[in-house]
A protein has these predicted regions:
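Metal-associated gating/positioning segment near the N- to mid-region
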Residues: 50-111
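C-terminal cap of metal-dependent C-N hydrolases
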Residues: 11, 336-390
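His/Asp/Glu-enriched, well-ordered alpha-helical/loop segment
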Residues: 263-344
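Divalent metal-coordination and catalytic microenvironments
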Residues: 11, 26, 31, 53, ...
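Metal-cofactor-binding active-site regions of metalloenzymes
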Residues: 85-91, 95-96, 111-141, 165-168
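Short, acidic/polar
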Residues: 71-80, 143-154, 203-209
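Active-site core of metal-dependent hydrolases
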Residues: 166-288
Length: 394
């Protein structure tokens, strides 16, 4: 039997998909996970990295990002984001539509070292006017809805397109209500893919959007502030939210610049309502705050009392299941060889939501390193996790 290419030695491995939480080694061969266990034996050519005292998880998946760098005003660099945030799979959510997806694929997705998958926007040019100087919702004009083109592009790019995206709300769709969502759902039905729906201020209402979503569809910005919050001012979860969860609608955080509230989150968690996935909605207008990155978004939930394994679950296996990509999100042997190395820094840390409310947390998740496709990709400190190779046996 051939030896391992890489072993991460002695970290606390947290893999919620396999109910693993303990000190283990993780081995990779041929770009895939090869084994998880104690004292895995290297061969002469195995690269060994000592991660004792650190946390090793499946490669983090950020279900809501904008990484069409250079092609849209809101796009950030996916590889830089991966290095800083420990994210090995970025899901771009509608930056590109059928009219410009070919450029996104050729110039960004195929050139990126980090993995990029995408929700295709039903609007022809995706999210094209989103900056500090100009803001125009792409769903405000139904003339820009391109259902036939979207079907054709989604069918031709099934290897990287995981679903259909639409944005509705006062800022994104003006007075169009749920009309853009209706078109997007028709596209999603036609290609047999899930849909992700953005929601902002009404119209339409939170309830009206939820009523249209199907099992497996994702409502992003799910813990947004008033108006269109999922709970009342008294902290009661709206009945439509509970009904949607029962039928299988997924609730994603999508922090961003305007879509995550501590007040809402406290109410939802107090009622035992966890999001299905935690994502950053990282883009040019929130990368310098209040979202910053995926690990900062995860840290907020950790500091609000969500146990670390549950936080990891929502950015690994839960995200993979939302994508219908079971080869991601777990360190199960045979899965894609991605892993993230994390640490927890104790102390006093300031966090802020989109309403300007500050919260002092007692810990912070730090991305220390990543493994991409079975190869060590990045360490926050160059000398940390320096590789070693065992001597060949005589």
């Amino acid at each position: 039997m051939a030896g391992y290419d890489l072993i991460l030695r002695g970290g606390r491995v947290i893999d919620p998909a396999q109910s693993i939480d303990g000190v283990n080694d993780v081995a990779f061969t041929g770009g895939k996970v090869a084994a998880v266990g104690r004292d895995l034996k290297p061969s002469a050519g195995t690269e060994v990295r000592n991660v004792t005292g650190y946390i090793v998880t499946p490669g983090l998946i950020d279900l809501h990002t904008h990484v069409y760098w250079g092609g849209t005003s809101l796009g950030i660099d996916a590889d830089e984001f991966c290095r800083n945030s420990g994210v090995t799979t970025s899901i771009d959510t509608g930056s590109a539509g059928p009219g410009n997806f070919a450029g996104f694929r050729k110039h960004v997705i195929e050139r990126s070292e980090a993995r990029i998958l995408a929700y295709l926007h039903v609007s022809f040019a995706g999210i094209y006017a989103f900056s500090k100087t100009i803001m125009y919702g792409e769903s405000q004009s139904m003339h820009l809805m391109a259902p036939r083109d979207a079907v054709a592009v989604a069918e031709a790019n099934r290897d990287v397109i995981v679903g259909i995206k639409v944005r509705v709300g006062l800022h994104a769709s003006g007075d169009q209500g749920t009309a853009p969502l209706n078109v997007a759902l028709q596209v999603a039905d036609e290609v047999g893919m899930p849909l992700m729906c953005h929601i902002d201020h009404p119209p339409p209402s939170y309830e009206a959007v939820l009523d249209m979503l199907r099992p497996g569809d994702v409502l992003t910005h799910a813990f947004r502030p008033f108006p269109n919050a999922p709970c009342t001012a008294q902290g009661t979860i709206k009945p439509a939210v509970l009904e949607a969860r029962k039928r299988g609608v997924l609730f994603d955080i999508g922090h961003g610049a305007g879509s995550f509230s501590f007040k809402t989150t406290r109410a939802m968690l107090a009622n035992g309502f966890m999001p299905d996935t935690i994502s950053s909605d990282i883009h040019t207008l929130c990368i310098d705050g209040p979202a910053f990155d995926q690990v900062t978004t995860l840290s907020k939930f950790l500091c609000m009392g969500v146990p670390l394994p549950e936080v990891i679950k929502q950015t690994t296996v839960n995200a993979a299941m939302a994508l219908r990509r079971p080869e991601l999100g777990s360190l199960k042997p045979g899965n894609v060889g991605d892993a993230t190395i994390l640490s927890i820094e104790e102390g006093s840390h300031d966090y802020v939501d989109v309403m300007g409310e500050h919260m002092t947390g007692d810990k912070r998740i730090i991305a220390e390193g990543t493994v991409l496709g079975g190869k060590f990709f990045h360490a926050r400190t160059p000398e940390r996790f320096a590789p070693s190779k065992p001597r060949a046996r005589a």
